[in-house]
Amino acid sequence: MVCVSNNKSYLKSQHLKIIGQKTLRGKVKISGAKNSALVLLAASLLTDEKIILDNVPLLTDIEKMGNILKNLGVKLHNKDHQLIIDSKNISIQELPYELVNGLRASFFCIGALLTRFGEASIPLPGGCNIGERPINEHINGLRALGAEIIIDRDVVKAKLVKKKTKLFGANIRLNCPSVGATETLIMAASLAEGRTVIENAAREPEIQDLCQMLNKMGAKIYDSGKEKIIIDGVHKLHGCTHKVIPDRIEAGTFLIAAAATSSSITVSPVIPNHLEAVLNKLEESGSKIIIKGNSISIKGNNIKAVDIKTAPFPGFPTDLQAPFMALMTIAKGRSKITETIFENRMNHVDLLNQMGSSITLKNNIAHINGVKKLRGMTLVGSDLRSSAALIIAALTSKSVSYVYGLEHLDRGYENFEQKLSKLGIEIKRQITKQTINKSKNRSSNSKLKEVSEIRAA
């Protein structure tokens, strides 16, 4: 319970009103992958020819990345889910902090700009508040390719070493299979002189999508999707047309929502092997899964407790840890969820407990005793995936829930509530202005009414 006082802090005015205990039924059209589209936008900086991207999701993160490119002089033309990108006349300049703040993917631009123009200045990025996501791997890798890098007042400034006109190939071994570092170094190496070998590379599908587009542009990249990636640098890259892969995280979120509500739905288009770890756990927890071509159907039933441990691809994705925890709160039995990727990605635990779940948390390991039902509440999501988890929990609850923090949700889910509505859920985006006290202390002098408002730290 948070007491409202005269020291007002206005929440974002939009929220979702959700009527719980409804069954999902029907088909969901899965959008293009956010995490792929963002890096493909950065990769468009590698050429002075036009890039046409199809199946681009309509998300606030994509809009932010587009604004970053525009600030550099890139011309963008968008129509529905297609983006035409013209990076011919780029002006190399330090990006304003207000543009990159809140979007970690903005840092992907450094590899592309450095290898094409010989210099780049990018402020340290933001993103969801889910823990430290250091850029050491990016910087060490770029230095191995021949870059001089300094960090001056939270701005990363990179340039070629003296008397060099290009980056040069190198053997690089990452200390951990960082997705962002792997993508940054692939882009930088694509126009470098000679061969680059990246060992302990990340294997995520979004990296494979990046490499497929770069190869269409004339790059020579081998073994993407494996732990060792080989890049032979080329002199120039040209334009191409490329379709963004389906969003495996969005698909997984809807599948988990169906399992949590004992529902039957079909998601498509998807690439089923991108979701293998998730599908295995859903089957283990009692759901029936049917794969046909580029579609996956699920029939949820009798939720059983299962343990998960997040891991780099092809392991269980950290982006679905929070939604899966919402499922496990109403499972029969005890389960354990271990987060190994980010050290601060359990903000949803307190919120789920306020809804009636039984979760104890220690050292990024959540121990969950399943309960029969959760109760509806007014909640504020603190990051993208925890917001999705709260919505799933609200779908299973006994009453009405109000979920705030939609600025997080809109970063990564396109038309989320509309898609749920088409499946039969009573959900509506509403606009109001409510206030909460920034302090967690109860104020006896408050003249404003108390609300059941819980916010993740």
From Swiss-Prot:
Species whose genome carries this gene: Prochlorococcus marinus subsp. pastoris (strain CCMP1986 / NIES-2087 / MED4)
Function: Cell wall formation. Adds enolpyruvyl to UDP-N-acetylglucosamine.
Biased composition (Basic and acidic residues): 447-457
Keywords: Cell cycle, Cell division, Cell shape, Cell wall biogenesis/degradation, Cytoplasm, Peptidoglycan synthesis, Pyruvate, Transferase
Molecular function via GO: UDP-N-acetylglucosamine 1-carboxyvinyltransferase activity
Modification sites for 2-(S-cysteinyl)pyruvic acid O-phosphothioketal: 128
Name of this protein: UDP-N-acetylglucosamine 1-carboxyvinyltransferase
Pfam families the record matches: EPSP_synthase
Family: Belongs to the EPSP synthase family. MurA subfamily.
